């Protein structure tokens, strides 16, 4: 299936000069959504990642991470922006182009030596994915890979990620 044909391009969003890759058109397509989850699960199985948990990055990582976890027989754990989780958290601050941001995960969500796959809809510069990787590694988890629906190759996000399998289904 040609997933690119199901992803809408929106020029000048959220600001002039940016070409936004809109996944809502992929999400509304029944066959496209099913194929996306099945294909990502197949790639994870082929890589023999033996995942305990899928980590979904806020917020579109939740959309793909939850059904992927189900398909792989793993648990799903959300990583959220600061202040969005109600219980005690592990957190990490990371650099943005202009300032910093913070990611959090519940303290009781992950256990040392858990094998985790980090999932999001898109990798661009790799900043958020890299911070999520550092967060789960600080907890003592084994990061076994990343899964992305879209990869923006020109932004070279891969070079900021640990040396583990990186699965992307569509490249621009």
From Swiss-Prot:
Family, per entry: Belongs to the purine/pyrimidine phosphoribosyltransferase family.
Protein name: Adenine phosphoribosyltransferase
Gene label: apt
GO CC annotations on file: cytoplasm
Subunit structure as annotated in this protein's UniProt entry: Homodimer.
Entry's EC annotation: 2.4.2.7
Compartment list: Cytoplasm
Principal location class: cytoplasm
Organism name: Nostoc sp. (strain PCC 7120 / SAG 25.82 / UTEX 2576)
Record-level GO BP terms: adenine salvage; AMP salvage; purine ribonucleoside salvage
């Amino acid at each position: 299936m040609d997933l690119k044909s199901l992803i809408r391009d929106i020029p000048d969003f959220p600001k002039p000069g940016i070409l936004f890759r809109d996944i809502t058109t992929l999400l509304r397509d029944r066959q496209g959504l099913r194929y996306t989850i099945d294909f990502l699960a197949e790639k994870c199985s082929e890589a023999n990642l033996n995942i305990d948990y899928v980590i979904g990055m806020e917020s579109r990582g939740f959309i793909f991470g939850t059904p992927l976890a189900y398909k792989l027989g793993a648990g799903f754990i959300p990583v959220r922006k600061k202040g969005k989780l109600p219980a005690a958290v592990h957190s990490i601050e990371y650099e943005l182009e202009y300032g910093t941001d913070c990611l959090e995960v519940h303290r009781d969500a992950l256990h040392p030596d858990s094998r985790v796959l980090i999932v999001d809809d898109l990798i661009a510069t790799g900043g958020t994915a890299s911070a999520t990787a550092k967060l789960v590694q600080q907890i003592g988890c084994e990061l076994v890979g990343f899964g992305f629906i879209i990869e923006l190759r020109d932004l070279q996000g891969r070079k900021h990620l640990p040396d583990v399998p990186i699965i992307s289904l569509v490249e621009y």
